[in-house]
Each structure stands twice: as structure tokens, then as C-alpha cells.
Amino acid sequence: SSAASDVYKRQAIDSTLAAKIKAKKSTQYEYLVSELKEEKALNYDRLLMLNTFNFDIDNDEYIYPSGTSQANTNIDVYVVDTNPEVYVGDFITPYHESDGAYYGNTKGVFMKLLALPPHGLYMDLSCDITISSGTGSFQVEYQKMVGGVPSVGSVNGSHTSGLKAGSVYHYNEKGLVLVDPTKNESGKIGMVYRIYLNTEAGVRIKIENFKMSVYYMAKMQPERIDVIKPDVLLNRLLKSMNEENEGYVGEIEYQDDTRLSSTVIMAAESARGLDGAKIYTSFKNFSDWMEVVYGYVPDIAENKVVFKKRTSLFHSEVQKRISYTGMDFKVKVNSSLIYSLLRVGYDKQDYDSINGRDEFHFTNEYDTGITITDKALELISPLRADPYGIEFLVSKRGKDTTDNESDNDAFFVGAHLKENAECYELVREGYKVSGIISSSTIFNAMFSPRSIIEANKEYIGSFVKSLRFASSSGNSDIRINDVAENLDIELTDPLFTVSTLSISTADGGIPSDVNALVEVERNSLLYTCFINELKYKIGHYEGVDYNLQIKSIG
């Protein structure tokens, strides 16, 4: 959870609403999504996923068949499929000698093409080959019967004539094109693929370090998911904290962050498509999420909670000027505001899929360069934003398994509802993402860990001046709009400093705006400060005790 919300608070006047929030902020409530959802659902149009068939060699030594007088022959390389990770199927299938004829009875056949993957089909293949005498070649070939006539071709780049006795031939090709998405290759549907070696007579061949995979990108069918607007959830939480009575109002100043006006919340159970889906959350979770992701904090007054940009609570005009000559003048560094480490982002999730390695909505750590403490400032969102997490949940629709790890989680996504549209659509416009497999379909780029620092930069800049990227629990090779997610960051515009000033003054006049600046003049220095706390006794004229957070000294 966010430590920031506990770090620096102006002392709010304790209204009944403030007292209720204080008492019940951590209580977790559950609500039926059907009671809070938007009239129109999100059209979740899926992530492109990598699908991989891996093949291994069945036998690593091949001997030229004896008793033949041919000058050379084709020797089949037997391969078998192992550990496929197939997310969207029905394009290719492993296929072996017993599955049908290929040159009568060929053992080197390993797969058949059933349909054309829309983004192409590719192969990576590497191995080391030694031959006992003479020379030879190594080849991947495809064939199908068309009207009783075999149509045969060779995979470009897979043919090598470099085998010769006395040396190891290192074969290594990546991205061999089996189906080119830029061409009409419908004639390849039904092809079977085979690997063989062509050698002279009487040889022994050894193949080692064999690695082969065939892969393609594809996505599943779009699904509709119910979503909830942040202010609707906020008002439902206020009603729960008020014993199910109306009377309290929650508002969000959407206009100060364009990302927020296109944010919707999604329950994990909604992503799963479960009947009677519920969302589980608390006011603290909601508040921490708003603070971490958008830099918004709750402003509580009377019977209203307004979430607004933290910076808007620090007013720039000077409300009061004090010329101070008294003795009770204490400036000290508030050590609770000093950190050696900044953690930002989201809790790490474990996926059992190679695709999940691309996810970058996890935790980034930055070194502040401060060595006098080992404290960390954590800005970790309690709501999740990981696209792969949503994709894996949606892919479980129709399956009865429970995913205890994440069924109670809540997600949020950037989505907008265009005029007259029947669904919310994911926002991808304006965000160019690289360093990721599914760059064209990834979403939530606007909520990367780096964006959290941007949303809170004046606040974080009050404690540290520069952040050196240390590590990421996710994919740190990501670039968003050509900015690397793992760049160091300089912070130049702090809200305040880590020093406080305490004074007691006989001047009993209270500033009318407690969020405005107070200037204190002493010994020809001018201390410009925000009010942390002020104490005065109503009806007893004993002056005012100020606890001030210094913004600048000049």
C-alpha cells in the first residue's frame, strides 16, 4: 500500500464524515457489479499472444542405410513435439509418419499446416552436425499432394550444403518464414513439413544441441466485460461507511488528469465472466490507488469528499506574514521524509506463460542516492493494471476453475466511450510501445510505473532530487513514445522541503486559507512555508503555535 498517504497531511478539521472515514477506511466491502456497472460494457478486443510448438530430436545419430547402391540418399531426421505453449489453436498440428504418406513412408515429417495464421508462421532452428566422411546437406522441406501430384518446396534459409567430414557444422537460423503474412499463401494449407539430411553413401551423422520451434501470433475472440466508473464506486463506498444511508457525496476532479477521465474499473470476476460477479474494495484501497496512479488526494469538508490533484491543495498565494523576534524558533529536518529507495508501480504477478514475461505493470525500484537511512517510499497501486493479467482471466471464461490468487482483485483500464458507440473501447491512441511482443495490441501504457512518478513528481521531488533506476520486477526493456521505462529521472519542482519550522506567536490572527503560504521573517531571512498544524485556544488569548513545512528560505 502507499506510504505516501501517511507521510504528509495537513490536519483536516474533524467533521463527522472525516471521523467515519478514519474509522472505516480499511473495511473491505463487496458489491455486485451489476448494481454499479456502466450501461455499456467494455469491448475487450484481446492481446496478440505468442503461440509456440517446440520440437526435440528423437535420435541423435543417423547411419546411412546399408545395402543400397545409390550415390546419395535422404536420411530422415526424427523430431517430436514437446511442451507446446498454444493459446490460440487450429493453425498447425504436430504430424508424424503414422499420420499419412509422404514419399510413401517418411519418418522426418513433423507438422501439418491447417490454416494460415494472420500474422505469419515462423521457425527458429539450431543444431550442430558432424559427418563421418564425404559431404552432405541439411534441409527443411514441405509438400502436399495436389491432384495426385506432389507439390514440393524448400523453406528458404533452411537449406545448407556445408556439411563436410572433420568439422562441426553450426546451423542457426531464426525467423525462417513458413507463411508470409504479406502474400496470399492459401496454397500452403494442408502442407506437411519434413526435415532430412542428404548425404553420400556409407556415412555416419551426428546431430547435437538440437533446438527447433515453430511459432505465430494470434488473438482470441473479443469479449464484453462490465466496467464501473471511479466516482460511482466512490459514492457506493461512502454510502457503506454511512450505514447504507445517503447524505455523503463523492466527487472526482476529472479535468486535472486526462487519463482519469478515461479510466474504468473492472472486477476480476467480471473479466472471468462469472455470474453474480462482485467487486471487493475499501475506501483506503480506492484512496491509495487515486494517490499513487494520479497524484490525487481526498479533500474532506462537511458532507463531501472531493478527490483532487495533490498540488491543487498547496496554494501559491501568501496569506500571512509574520515578523518573528521570539525565542521559540525551531528549524529541524523531518527525518521521516527521507528515503533511500523509491518503489513504484504494482505488485508482481506470477503467470504460467511465456507471454507474461512481456508485462511491465509491476514494481520499479529507484535509488535516491541517500545513504543515511534504509527507508523506502512506496507508491504501489492496490488496483491492478496488467494487460496480461486481464487476458489470462478472460481466457478462463467458461472454465469452472477458481483462480484464488486473483478472483478478488480489481483492475483498471484506460477506455473511452465514443459518441453513439455501443461499447467502451480500450485507449491505445497516442501511445507507441516497443520492446514487447504484442506492441500493436498492448494497452494501459499510460499507467506504466514511470507514469506514477510523473503524476507525483512535485511530491516525490520534495524528498529527493534524482532517481537512479535500479531494477524492475517486470519487463524493463519497454519504451513508451520513445522514452525508455528504465531511464533515470531528475526531479526539479518540489512542493516543499524536508525541513519544518515551529514557532509560537502572540499574534492570534488565523489565516483564512490554511492551504496558503505563510511567510516568517527572522534575522533578514524569509521562510516561506505551508501550515502543517496550528494550535490555538478559542476564548483564551494565548497566541498561536505553528508547525510549518518550509517551502523555501530566501
What kind of feature is each model-predicted range?
Residues 2-8:
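Short, small-residue-biased leader/transition segments that mark boundaries at the very start
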Residues 9-52, 56, 215-321:
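Charged- and aromatic-enriched interaction segments used to assemble
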Residues 47-144, 203-209:
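Terminal (often C-terminal
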Residues 98-101, 253-320, 327-554:
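An acidic/polar, Gly/Ser/Thr-rich interaction patch typically located in mid-to-C-terminal regions
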Residues 176-199:
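Noncatalytic modules at the cell exterior or secretory-pathway interfaces
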Residues 199-221:
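Proprotein-processing/basic-patch segments
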